[in-house]
From Swiss-Prot:
It holds the Pfam family Keratin_B2_2. The lineage of its organism: Eukaryota, Metazoa, Chordata, Craniata, Vertebrata. Belongs to the KRTAP type 4 family. PANTHER family: KERATIN ASSOCIATED PROTEIN, KERATIN-ASSOCIATED PROTEIN 4-11-RELATED. The gene is KRTAP4-5. It comes from Homo sapiens. This is Keratin-associated protein 4-5.
Length: 181
């Protein structure tokens, strides 16, 4: 069994095991007890960190990615290996934060430390000028509202979110007429 299957690596102790004697497994790097699977038998995959049934994919076999919840084709990257981040829409270098992993929030300009909040991950909020703590509120996350002078609780009214309208003496909706700003 050993001589007919394992060929040049028959002298290795692990190659004498019956579960390793398959044509697809007979490689120097693959004749190991826990690594003899067709999908696992590649040099870059036969590592101690990759010996899991759920982790034998070529794209998954890196030390920081070999975990059951990380072995997906679109999620096998070091920065993506978090339980809350292993999704197709979240596996990006700048977007793998637990609070950032929603489809509408996974954009480079939105995934910042000050912007990755559950209350701020909305399409209307994900612009570079809107990603700061004072702007990420339900009543303030609008592109036209999210500029530094406008980002305040008082100024972000539904009818009054024009930069030219929000001044210290005119923070109320009744002041925001076109002739009043």
């Amino acid at each position: 069994m050993v001589s007919s299957c394992c060929g040049s690596v028959s002298s290795e102790q692990s190659c004498g095991l019956e579960n390793c004697c398959r044509p697809s497994c007979c490689q120097t790097t693959c004749c190991r007890t826990t690594c003899c699977r067709p999908s696992c038998c590649k040099p870059q995959c036969c590592q101690s960190v990759c010996y899991q049934p759920t982790c034998c994919h070529p794209s998954c076999c890196i030390s920081s990615c070999c975990r059951p919840y990380c072995c997906e084709s679109s999620c096998c990257r070091p920065c993506c290996c978090q339980t809350t981040c292993c999704r197709t829409t979240c596996c990006r270098t700048t977007c793998c934060c637990p609070s950032c992993c929603v489809s509408s929030c996974c954009r480079p300009q939105c995934c910042q430390s000050v912007c990755c909040q559950p209350t701020c991950c909305r399409p209307s909020c994900c612009i570079s000028s809107c990603c700061h703590p004072s702007c990420c509120e339900s009543s303030c996350c609008r592109p036209c509202c999210c500029v530094r002078p406008v980002c305040g609780r008082v100024s972000c009214h539904t009818t009054c979110y024009r930069p030219t309208c929000v001044i210290s003496t005119c923070p109320r909706p009744l002041c925001c007429a076109s002739s009043c700003c």
